[in-house]
């Protein structure tokens, strides 16, 4: 299918709210006014605290109302027939995915929303086939919303967020608008840092699906121990890390419950994944190793077309070197 026109617009605007109201110092009295001041008033003035006079001459501190930033992005395509390939125009002659994002920050507090609008989802994106869900406009189009408090050694987030444990083999929640992909998590997350030696994350959330959430529950934790910081290695960075994620199904899938007698395995409502990692860095050299294990889960065997129920595991090893004008990764 030939795409005649593709419009991609990214518009960002940042508004800085100082909300500062300056208060001018009280002007000094002129000579005529000074002459009218009685000796009694002068005597009273002599008894005043000189510090209070100094404060009254200073302007009040300016008030900070925070920082507001926003962006708007639209990916719009108009489709035309292509006689060479035989491609025809879909039911809707155009597709359009639109995103409006606003973020507000005041000190350690932050909050944000993301509004999405799909009058006709783009062909070839994951939303295709779910037009009946995407089309139109309602409160469900407010897909991302969060509030967060970030302190020096901890943070708390409630709402929708993105997260990744390790390399992302057992947990990765991310967004790619060009691909039309978003599997953010809606729930709560807490992070902490103890003297740059121990860092951790814990979360409980529901994964996003279309404009809503799945009933599947995700609970997990990630912990990192910096051995180099603990023993005072300045040039080397060595850390030991681990993660665990539990995926809990509120209800077993219908394809299993309706045809239970056709399967020779008992599908569990809980699937646990875990990983252990070692990271090492020295100047330009870096090396990472991760092992991942997974409890029994079902997947479709592409060779036989049958459902298979078994444990899983994976290993990932990366090594690289970064020089002044080059980098090598394997």
Give the positions of each predicted feature.
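Sec-dependent signal peptide recognition
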Residues: 3-10
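N-terminal periplasmic/intermembrane-space "pro-region" immediately following the signal or transit peptide
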Residues: 11, 20-90
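Signature for the C-terminal beta-barrel architecture of outer-membrane proteins
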Residues: 59-95, 105-115, 120-131, 135-138, ...
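A short acidic, glycine/proline-enriched capping/turn motif at secondary-structure boundaries
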Residues: 120, 154, 163-165
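Phosphate/ribose-recognition catalytic cores of enzymes acting on nucleotide-derived substrates
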Residues: 144
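Surface-exposed extracellular loop regions of Gram-negative outer-membrane beta-barrel proteins
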Residues: 162-169, 173, 330
């Amino acid at each position: 299918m030939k795409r005649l026109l593709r419009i991609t617009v990214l518009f960002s605007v940042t508004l800085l709210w100082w909300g500062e109201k300056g208060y001018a110092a009280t002007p000094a009295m002129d000579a005529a006014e000074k002459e009218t001041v009685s000796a009694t008033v002068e005597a009273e003035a002599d008894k005043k605290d000189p510090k209070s006079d100094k404060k009254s001459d200073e302007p009040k501190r300016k008030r900070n109302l925070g920082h507001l930033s926003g962006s708007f992005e639209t990916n719009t395509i108009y489709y035309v027939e292509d006689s060479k390939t035989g491609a025809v125009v879909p039911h809707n002659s155009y597709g359009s995915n639109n995103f409006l994002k606003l973020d507000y920050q005041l000190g350690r507090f932050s909050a944000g929303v993301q509004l999405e609008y799909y009058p006709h989802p783009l062909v070839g994106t994951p939303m295709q086939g779910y037009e009946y869900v995407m089309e139109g406009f309602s409160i469900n189009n407010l897909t991302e919303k969060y509030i967060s408090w970030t302190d020096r050694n901890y943070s708390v987030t409630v709402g929708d967020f993105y997260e990744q444990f390790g390399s992302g083999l057992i947990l990765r929640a991310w967004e790619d608008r060009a691909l039309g992909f978003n599997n953010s998590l809606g729930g709560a997350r807490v992070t902490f840092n103890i003297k740059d030696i121990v860092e951790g994350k814990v979360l409980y959330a529901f994964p996003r699906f279309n404009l809503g959430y799945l009933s599947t529950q995700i609970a997990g934790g990630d912990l990192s121990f910096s051995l180099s910081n603990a023993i005072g290695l300045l040039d080397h960075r060595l850390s030991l890390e681990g993660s665990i994620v539990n995926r809990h199904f509120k209800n077993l899938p219908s394809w299993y419950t309706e045809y239970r007698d056709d399967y020779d395995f008992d599908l569990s409502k809980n699937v646990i994944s875990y990983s252990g990692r070692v990271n090492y860095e020295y100047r330009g050299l870096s090396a990472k190793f991760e092992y991942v294990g997974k409890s029994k889960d079902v997947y479709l065997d592409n060779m036989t077309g049958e459902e298979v129920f078994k444990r899983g595991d994976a290993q990932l090893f990366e090594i690289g070197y970064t020089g002044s004008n080059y980098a090598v990764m394997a």
